[in-house]
């Protein structure tokens, strides 16, 4: 029996085409919630940038954020996983030398380093981010502990810098940037932490995703569902492929497995 659902946000809950949550998804989550199933996001976004799910915010029991680096259930922080400080500083140096725009996500605040128009376009035009409070200096954000680095680097630059960050891993869910986290921070470990906190078995969880940073949780969950709009590599890591986010994919999968 499925007792907890975990949803990626962009491309899974929220359509990249409409930038909205389909009505069928809202109704499906409400039905699952009414049956006592716990509902969580599992997203690369930090909490400050999670502004695109207002229609279902009231249904969320908790959040897996920053690709698993921060896990919250209710008001309880279940898991925090920070990037090693020396590797954060090494990446700052790399960004400085190569003029790379990068978002540093601290425990409390966010700062954008080398901000440019491309960053503004992706965050505010493409991903519809509304957060714009970047008044805390980067040094202070780093001192809080860095949960995630979202860097607008090319694939080649990513391959160049990652060997210098042995305590980190990366995952790309949008072409323009990659999310860098602690090597032990991923959505799968986030689900494991939440399941342990809830006192349920991992086999009683179900995860939905479409992007590269979803593969680990699709394999870890009791049932891993890839959206129809996912790339083939993600689909290959899932137990089941549903229809796309715009074609009632979440509702269809929840009905298929008898969750609703």
What is the meaning of each model-derived region?
Residues 23-118:
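Active-site phosphate-binding/coordination module
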Residues 94, 98-208, 212-217, 229:
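Conserved acidic, metal-coordinating active-site core of Asp-based
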Residues 60-66, 81, 124, 170-174, ...:
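Short hydrophobic/aromatic-enriched beta-strand-loop microsegments
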Residues 36-40, 59, 145-149, 203-205, ...:
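Short active-site oxyanion
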Residues 1-4, 22, 180-260:
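Mg2+-dependent phosphoryl-transfer enzymes with acidic/Ser/Thr/Gly-rich catalytic loops
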Residues 57-60, 80-83, 119-124, 189, ...:
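Short, hinge-like loop/turn segments at secondary-structure boundaries
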Residues 3-18:
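Asp-based phosphoryl-transfer active-site loop
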Residues 56-59, 66-67, 164-167, 220-221, ...:
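Short, structured coil segments at secondary-structure junctions
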């Amino acid at each position: 029996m499925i007792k907890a659902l975990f949803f990626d946000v962009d491309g899974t809950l929220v359509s990249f085409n409409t930038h909205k949550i389909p009505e069928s998804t809202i109704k499906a989550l409400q039905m699952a919630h009414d049956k006592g199933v716990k509902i969580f996001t599992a997203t690369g976004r930090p909490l400050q940038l999670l502004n695109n799910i207002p229609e279902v915010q009231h249904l969320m029991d908790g959040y897996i954020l920053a690709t698993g680096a921060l896990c919250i259930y209710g008001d309880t922080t279940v898991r925090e996983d920070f990037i090693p400080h020396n590797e954060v500083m090494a990446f700052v140096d790399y960004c400085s030398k190569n003029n790379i725009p990068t978002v540093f996500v601290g425990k409390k605040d966010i700062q954008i380093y080398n901000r440019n128009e491309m960053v503004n376009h992706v965050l505010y035009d493409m991903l519809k981010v509304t957060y714009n409070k970047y008044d805390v200096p980067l040094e202070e954000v780093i001192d809080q502990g860095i949960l995630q680095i979202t860097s607008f680097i090319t694939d080649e630059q990513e391959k160049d810098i990652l060997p210098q960050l042995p305590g980190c891993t990366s995952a790309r869910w949008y072409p323009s940037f990659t999310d860098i986290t602690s090597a032990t921070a991923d959505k799968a470990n986030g689900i494991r932490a939440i399941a342990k906190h809830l006192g349920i078995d991992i086999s009683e969880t179900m995860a939905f995703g479409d992007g590269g940073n979803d593969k680990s949780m699709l394999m870890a969950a009791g049932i891993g569902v890839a959206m129809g709009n996912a790339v083939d590599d993600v689909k290959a890591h899932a137990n089941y492929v549903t229809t796309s986010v715009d074609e009632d994919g979440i509702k269809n999968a929840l009905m298929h497995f008898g969750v609703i």
